[in-house]
């Protein structure tokens, strides 16, 4: 019996010019994919300076502060304030613009900011403590959501996000942050509401941090770091000096979270530049331990 061999197709041979064109296209696609890839979560460009205004022992003004942040190679500031800073709200915005800084977030709220946000075309996140009302669990969620609704509406009108901030109490528990956020989104169509999570207000959460980060992640607008020891000893600690720092940053790196990362001063007896620099040095130390060369390269 004769087995018939099927006719084999003639190999396609591209002219040299076509082959080069295909190589160019492939190279462009590879470059485009690389360009679209998000920066490593702990990259310098992803960092936000936080708690550097009332806590700064050097008592800098807007221009000095902007110069200091730029000198450290940071590009984003979350602005916290006290009553004495209200007269310089606009000067702060202008100083950041002059130094190429993003006015990333504004603490709580002040009516003077509405006009300034529109006037200067900035769109900061508004960071507000999640309330801790009394009552039963489900009622607390509704009450907290209703308390936040006026600010949520103000943020919506301004084109800003509202970040629910953990600051202790019932409202600072991750499950309750998520519950209030979900209520506002479901009941008031407030999809611009999310969560700002702070490690320095979350020492009790460390044993369950991986689980809690997974719960919060769909709503997370910013994650603020801190050196972490057991029992808040001390509460504020530079990164790299805490017993849990490597483990916590490893969890964050492996979680898939790619949003902003905050580093803090929050020490009224310390120059804010010294505090931020200590956190940057500590962050690099932890990144070396984690082998995160991609993030480390951004600090060269």
Where do the language-model regions lie?
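Catalytic domains of carbohydrate-active enzymes, especially glycoside hydrolases
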Residues: 62-85, 102-104
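N-terminal secretory signal peptides that target proteins for export/translocation
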Residues: 1-10
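Conserved beta-strand positions in the central sheet of alpha/beta enzyme cores
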Residues: 51, 78, 104-107, 125-126, ...
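Active-site mouth loops of central-metabolism enzymes
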Residues: 48-61, 133-141, 237-238
